[in-house]
Amino acid sequence: SPWITCLETHPLRTSTVLAHIRHATHGAITLENTQPFVRELWGRVHVFAHNGDLGSNLSHGSVAAPRYRAIGETDSEAAFCLLVERLVAGVDPARVDAGDVIFETFAAFAREMRERGPANIIYASNGRLLLHADRRTQAPGVIEPPGLWLLERHCSDGATVAVAGEGVHVAGVGVDVALVASVPLTGERWRPLEQGSVLQLEYGRVRRTERV
């Protein structure tokens, strides 16, 4: 892929990476329908990726005048806009418990989306990554768990480890890394996540886990 060449030739560094390969179930194959989706809230970047099918009738429900509207045609972007609207309505970012309220808002949102269809969701902002594991289409064509897999690594001092294949590597001094994917990307011991699991990851570690 040309993207691999770009990553190999440009020394990009970040603490959070979201990558998404889309099987287009809703909307045309266009840039505006390409994940991950990004919005601004509270002066921060919020990023969202979804794997599954939530149907085509998502709406903002009780939100009378939604601030966040989809640019493209996908169910995933419509769901993201709905999540951001609920964060606006329910979270005061200045409160000391804002992180807990964000987690609870995300968990309730994910549970609702799961009732519509497969809802494997990753949402990240301000160094915090939240995810909801559901079900997905497996190799035999059956929709069932697991929808996401987790691998936790500790990179020893000065070590550089390939995430999967070439192009993306994890390096640092005593760095903890958490990798989440639809399927295991390496031969290591990936852990399947139970359906309904909501996890909060920070600095490469799982900080909170709940079932919803």
What are the residue ranges of the model-derived segments?
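Conserved short alpha-helical segments that host acidic/polar catalytic motifs at enzyme active sites
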Residues: 1-50, 54-212
